[in-house]
UniProtKB/Swiss-Prot annotation:
InterPro entries on file: HflD, HflD-like_sf
Record carries keyword Membrane: yes
Lipid bilayer topology: Peripheral membrane protein
Taxonomic classification: Bacteria, Pseudomonadati, Pseudomonadota, Gammaproteobacteria, Alteromonadales
Keywords: Cell inner membrane, Cell membrane, Cytoplasm, Membrane
Main location group: cytoplasm
Pfam families reported in the protein's UniProt record: DUF489 (PF04356)
UniProt key word Lipid biosynthesis: no
Name recorded for this polypeptide: High frequency lysogenization protein HflD homolog
Family under the similarity heading: Belongs to the HflD family.
Length: 205
């Protein structure tokens, strides 16, 4: 397999994995802690030797690959909400990269979280609150806010709001990586088959 395409597809699976977790959390108000940790940990790997270093939990990433098959493949069951969130994340990623200080501020704030992890687990409420504030302070104001749909009772809970923002930050991290690996929105239209085929092969590895 083309290594660049494999890495790019891995990063794209990372975006979809985090977005699907946002959707699940907004609807049900709960998320498996290991799955949450898998996405949040990707934010903290800022200087990876290779793409696989970013996505340590390969089991959770399989959900991202399956979402690629569903969203870009021939399925008639495409999730319009997932697509809407994806479009929103990719639009904000463009604005982040084009902003003068966005990426630098992001790196600085992520370093602070890394120091916090000497004392807390990544799924600790204090760490999640910190990650959520990074999203609110640096990314959310760059463009139109992503409107999250779900159960109003769940969405009113501050901890759910914070987890959703932290997961959107994780989706943004994967979007930045996807773009760094040569990912372009037109690939999602004109290179769909290659992406789907790569996701299928990655699922069987």
């Amino acid at each position: 397999m083309n290594e660049q395409l494999v890495n790019r597809t891995m990063a794209f699976a990372g975006i979809l994995q985090a977005i699907a977790q946002v959707q699940h959390l907004a609807r049900h108000g709960e998320l498996d802690n290991a799955e949450l940790a898998a996405s949040l940990n990707t934010i903290l790997v800022t200087n990876p030797d290779n793409t696989a270093d970013v996505y340590q939990d390969k089991i959770v990433l399989q959900k991202g690959y399956k979402l690629i098959l569903n969203q870009l493949g021939d399925s008639s069951q495409k999730d319009v909400e997932i697509t809407r969130y994806l479009v929103g994340v990719l639009a904000l990623e463009r604005k982040l990269v084009r902003s003068n200080s966005g990426l630098g501020m992001l790196a600085e704030r992520i370093n602070q979280v890394n120091r916090q992890l000497h004392h807390f687990a990544i799924t600790d409420e204090q760490v999640i609150a910190n990650l959520a504030s990074i999203y609110s302070d640096i990314i959310s104001n760059l463009g139109p806010k992503i409107q999250i749909s779900g159960n109003p009772v769940c969405l009113q809970r501050p901890i759910i709001q914070q987890k959703i923002r932290a997961l959107l930050l994780a989706a943004m991290r994967s979007a930045v990586l996807w773009r760094q690996l040569g990912g372009k929105r037109r690939h999602l239209v004109f290179a769909r088959k290659a992406i789907v085929d790569t996701a299928k092969k990655s699922l069987t590895l």
